[in-house]
């Protein structure tokens, strides 16, 4: 028995529940899919299909659950979309209003820009042209954009998003022209197909296979990337044609999904679909047409959302990057409706991933999956060397921005900073802009990079997006206050208040940052400076060179309200210290951090075969062995026996070991490295 049309409180929702061992993997197997095919696309090493390692398959089958819940079930009744938009507590600035200056963010953005401009539009559009029956002489791309890869077309969507964000941030005409050219090419293909708005680089037969439960590689995943890219081109690059093409695609999705029963659609959702819910909610938001939100509601995967709504971590065995985008979509629905189920599940999901499933870098997963119960990373880390899929870090950062906007809690920015500094800035190769698929935590691992024309992994795509919009989280604001979240050289223009502020810093090489008011109204306003959780109570602030009596509490904001004048300067000092961070279930396995920076032991990359440099992840058994020593603690604190190296910023050396090692930030480590150590 289920309840219908009854408003339920959080308290009623959280009643007891029971589980039976039939879940996503079993359901998808019965539906004609392999467990991995139903849950994710991430490690396809051939062009058409992927079978996960036996260990991952076994864990999928053992761990997934189908929830049986004491009534009322959270999603028993059909969803009804009722617009009741949330007013977020904090809002980000438009990309054009935050200008990056010298430092790691502007470098990464430039490398990424050059990577994108090095891929010709006719090559990107080739598969779309062929699918539409249009002539093309363009040379095909390889990897996941090869003509026989079932995920072909996804990177084109990522490219559109990257071009849109780059243009929004820089106003550069060349990058806008690239994005506009792709949109025009896609519109041409859509008109030629003339199929109710359908557009992709593969035929609708892929969706017929999805409908019949036959193996196919995530067609809605690819559609989402294209639709999201079109959305971004409209929102950030003022391309009206992009909205027209997107609306046509949404119409096709609406018609296709509307023809399925609720039960059948739930089975279809066992195959990875990216953030289809999110992009449809976004389209509803900008058009005011709730038709698209109702279409987005059809992508509510109840088997996954129900445990989260009941605050139960049943993530073991699930493919991480299948599910994080689904939660981002849930967060977006909460913002449009204030339906607490979607807000609660987004919050709980973030909490359980970041508190019980997170490595020191802020990343999560092994072999693309959560392979263990919460707080068992000591077991998971040893299963394979393919830790921390980069797409997952990117999408967790997207989710963080939603939650931070709702609450304004500094802890979200502590997490965001950790992922950005260690994971995201640590996986883009200087100059080439080539990026990795995984960030391995295996001792003696190395970073394996994509190539210019023959990879196009999912993580190549999310990386292209991310490094285009690195200015989007440094500052937020409410009606009265400017929030300084991250410490990078930059300028912000708060147009509504007539405020301009410049941040000068060489953080993290330096413990200081300086905020200079360049323009201010006569009325008072507030500046809130994040005091990171990693600093000490000895943090200090100065206003116009005079010490302030107040110190900020680590993990909060220092609030300064005054009638600011042009030339006012705030200097913030955040002492950094060296700390050890053990795994919860194995305290002898530890990572070391300096402030927010994860440190990595440095080992030479000697005699590593070239072909091992460009795989999706490090193949440890095929590489020459590296001897990573165990360490013996020589004091109560890590700083007692790991000391800075004079004259070498952010470089440290152990002392008193049988074999001492040098440590540098992981994001600067391009040899072989070790992050976690056996410490006695």
Which residue stretches match the model-derived regions?
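N-terminal secretory signal peptides
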Residues: 1-27, 33-36
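Active-site neighborhood of glycoside hydrolase catalytic domains
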Residues: 283-306, 323-360, 393-395, 399, ...
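C-terminal beta-rich recognition modules with glycine/proline-rich loops and embedded aromatic residues
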Residues: 40-75, 346, 413-422, 427-518, ...
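Well-ordered alpha-helical segments within folded domains of soluble proteins
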Residues: 105, 149-168, 218-234, 269-284, ...
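Long, well-ordered core segments of solenoidal/helical folds
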Residues: 108-139, 179-197, 244-261, 291-311, ...
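Low-complexity, Ser/Thr/Pro/Gly-enriched N-terminal "stalk/linker" regions
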Residues: 40-155, 180-205, 240
